[in-house]
């Protein structure tokens, strides 16, 4: 209701975690973006990657699909191992970019806010998967668990992964407790939070500056009497 009653809303960003990815519509194979809208999304996504330092900008439907994909489909923007932004034929129009890809193999997110904001209200909507833990050291398009472990040891002082240790559980008996800690793996640790916030705020301001700037070109007045105009 709030959005419906505020047609002045022109842009939105929602923040999720994690992955270091800028997401945009479409989220389903049936949805196609007009070329003019896609150009705008691609242009802002590229600028967003530059300020956030994230590695990928993609539609929701394309993200990491099919399984094991290197995220090199049409309409995706990817940061290379040298830090440059590479675009993959951005004006395809959205939807199913993989040709023979079957619908059941794809990530179709029906009922998502991104598509709703865009299609129902004409709002330029992004969703950012903030914070990427680890680096794609072998440039295969994904950050593996071994790469994350290496990153934790070399960059995070081994603070994010807890070694598996035996524990006598009152109900389950002998178990092991350990693995990735939620804070640090899915969300940045406090020393890294400020930088993460600042980069995302810069992308928000960048998007806001790209919206139309309204001006009043002419004002007419009509006297209605009793000092009322």
Question: Where would I find each of the regions flagged by the language model?
Answer:
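Metallocarboxypeptidase
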Residues: 1-228
